[in-house]
């Protein structure tokens, strides 16, 4: 993408309404623009980040055996009355009426709708288990939206659901999804810690939140440093081996981890002192097991092996995709701007032409741009070198390929790594090889 033809409106000054780092940098780097309280338009570079995060989520959900679906955003109030949540949910749920005066709602979550779909589609225990998910825009009318995309009213979210014949199967699905989430966050280049959580309005008796560690996080967190070295690869844990899932879950839940709200000083004292870590965290996901709460309320049954009708056991699993964007910036930035992890960066590299209009530098930049394709943002603007450097640091792509007239004359470029700040003068092929890794 050529920056001269792109809608990436960077800002030199910090907007007054931005209170935290991620909000300031997302506005300044041209990722989003606010449309109303807690509602944002995602501009091209921001949307690329959303897509990169969502694609990692999709790949890890597929590995875990979950199927992607897409449900409507507008739901019938009758479904929520079946479960008893229509009146109980609270004012954060947007209630509307259509032209025929039928009560509808903008779904903040989808337990009811998917239970109804399963009720109409699944009749026998032979059709279970099922795991399904979607990635969709949602709306919750926060009383005081703030902190940019971390506490918005409209947000992009992955919500998943499992249906099992019995408790043992439901627990296996829960553990499978916990492993999938930990692998998802690791691929995104961030460290996440699972912590026991309240179930809130979704209900149930088992839940874990996933917190990304960030100096500016909203919650205080206490955790065992052994979380930092847990191996999550296929060699360590196989989704199809129940013993592996049990071992993974036992390992995760045997280590101390708690937010300040649930911190237990007596349990914390039992953690070896050299393994105690304190910091701040941002919640980016939560998983729930709630048994037959919805299948009973909505009369969803299947015929069991003995011919008796049974209510399937359920779980639900959420990841805040748009929230992750802000959380990752909170965890990965410096005074100059964003430092994107490789896997989710909008571009792998910024190409900086320091002598726009010079035949040699222009030709070399075009060669690099053609070689990197859609992974590169080519700063071909008629702008000062200092402005280009500042914007490249602000936008935070992993690599900067700097092309000046002296290096270009020798067929060389300067390659800067955004995270470390390391610079090296390299020939074109060597620079491209590093960027492509």
Curated annotation (Swiss-Prot):
User: What keywords are annotated for this sequence in UniProt?
Assistant: Aminoacyl-tRNA synthetase, ATP-binding, Cytoplasm, Ligase, Nucleotide-binding, Protein biosynthesis
Tell me which GO cellular component terms the UniProt record holds.
cytosol
Q: What is its EC number?
A: 6.1.1.15
Q: Which InterPro entries match?
A: aa-tRNA-synt_IIb (IPR002314), aa-tRNA-synth_II (IPR006195), aa-tRNA-synth_II/BPL/LPL (IPR045864), Anticodon-bd (IPR004154), Anticodon-bd_dom_sf (IPR036621), Pro-tRNA-ligase_IIa (IPR002316), Pro-tRNA-synth_IIa_bac-type (IPR004500), Pro-tRNA_synthetase (IPR050062)
Per the record's keyword annotation, is Cytoplasm included, yes or no?
Answer: yes
What residue intervals traverse the membrane?
Answer: none
Assembly and binders? Homodimer.
- Pfam families, sorted: HGTP_anticodon, tRNA-synt_2b
The chemistry this enzyme catalyses reads: tRNA(Pro) + L-proline + ATP = L-prolyl-tRNA(Pro) + AMP + diphosphate
Where in the cell does this protein reside? Cytoplasm
* Recorded GO MF terms: ATP binding; proline-tRNA ligase activity
User: Which species expresses this protein natively?
Assistant: Acidiphilium cryptum (strain JF-5)
Determine the domain of life of the protein's source.
Answer: Bacteria
Provide the family line: Belongs to the class-II aminoacyl-tRNA synthetase family. ProS type 2 subfamily.
Tell me where it mainly resides.
Answer: cytoplasm
GO terms in the biological process aspect are: prolyl-tRNA aminoacylation
Tell me the protein's name: Proline--tRNA ligase
């Amino acid at each position: 993408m050529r920056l001269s033809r792109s809608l990436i409106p960077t800002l030199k000054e910090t907007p007054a309404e931005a209170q935290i780092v991620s909000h300031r940098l997302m506005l300044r780097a041209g990722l989003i623009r606010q449309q109303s309280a807690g509602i944002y338009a995602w501009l091209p570079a921001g949307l690329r980040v959303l897509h990169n995060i969502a694609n990692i989520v999709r790949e890890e959900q597929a590995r875990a055996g979950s199927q992607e679906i897409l449900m409507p955003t507008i739901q019938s109030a009758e479904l929520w009355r079946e479960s008893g949540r229509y009146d109980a949910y609270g004012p954060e749920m947007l209630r509307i009426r259509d032209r025929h005066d039928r009560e509808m709602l903008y779904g903040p979550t989808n337990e009811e709708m998917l239970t109804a779909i399963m009720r109409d589609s699944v009749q026998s225990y032979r059709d279970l288990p099922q795991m399904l998910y979607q990635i969709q825009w949602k709306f919750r009318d926060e009383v005081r939206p703030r902190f940019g995309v971390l506490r918005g009213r409209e947000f992009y979210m992955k919500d998943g659901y499992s249906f099992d014949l019995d408790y043992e199967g439901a627990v296996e699905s829960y553990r499978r999804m916990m492993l999938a989430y930990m692998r998802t966050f690791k691929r995104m280049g961030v460290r996440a810690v699972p912590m026991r959580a309240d179930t809130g309005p979704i209900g149930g008796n088992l839940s874990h939140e996933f917190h990304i560690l960030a100096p500016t996080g909203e919650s205080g967190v206490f955790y065992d440093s052994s979380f930092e070295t847990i191996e999550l690869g296929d060699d360590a844990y196989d989704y199809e081996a129940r013993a592996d899932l049990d071992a993974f879950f036992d390992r995760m839940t045997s280590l101390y981890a708690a937010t300040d709200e649930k911190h237990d000083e007596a349990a914390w004292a039992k953690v070896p002192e050299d393994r105690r870590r304190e910091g701040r965290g941002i919640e980016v996901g939560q998983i729930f097991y709630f048994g037959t709460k919805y299948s009973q309320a909505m009369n969803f049954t299947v015929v069991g092996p003995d011919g008796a009708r049974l209510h399937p056991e359920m779980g639900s699993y959420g990841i805040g995709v748009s929230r992750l964007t802000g959380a990752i910036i909170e965890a990965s930035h410096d005074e100059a701007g964003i430092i994107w992890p490789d896997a989710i960066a909008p571009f792998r590299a910024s190409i900086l032409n320091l002598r726009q209009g010079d035949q040699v530098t222009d030709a070399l930049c075009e060669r690099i741009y053609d070689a990197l394709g859609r992974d590169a943002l080519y700063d071909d603007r008629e702008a000062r070198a200092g402005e280009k450097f500042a914007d490249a640091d602000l936008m935070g792509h992993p690599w900067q390929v700097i092309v000046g007239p002296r290096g270009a004359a020798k067929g060389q470029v300067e390659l800067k790594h955004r995270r470390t700040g390391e610079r090296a003068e390299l020939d074109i092929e060597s620079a491209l090889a590093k960027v492509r890794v």
